[in-house]
């Protein structure tokens, strides 16, 4: 399948790389089909979450594993039922600023992807995490 992206032109992607949101990105309820785009130049800490239904819709996601000293999201039973059994990948929506060091990530509402099935959801954690956490604070 060939799809258009907001920032990276046209890309080819196998159907196995389609991510289906059972609980959509907040504010974007009409868009449920996405794919992750990795860029070798920037590593695996930041990826694009590109809509397959709207080429202009794309989010930057950040791997919050660098906050492992204090960020330990717990997935509720309800979310486990929604996502199904499998291995989960947790990503935080990145709000990129001109000065990267002032960028923030949403730790309260991560995007959780079942890596086995491709089912995803943006969830609100019951834990007390900030919606705008400075990306450089607590980074390893």
Language model segments and positions:
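Short beta-strand-centered segments at strand-helix junctions
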Residues: 71-78
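Conserved, well-structured core segments that form or line functional sites
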Residues: 82
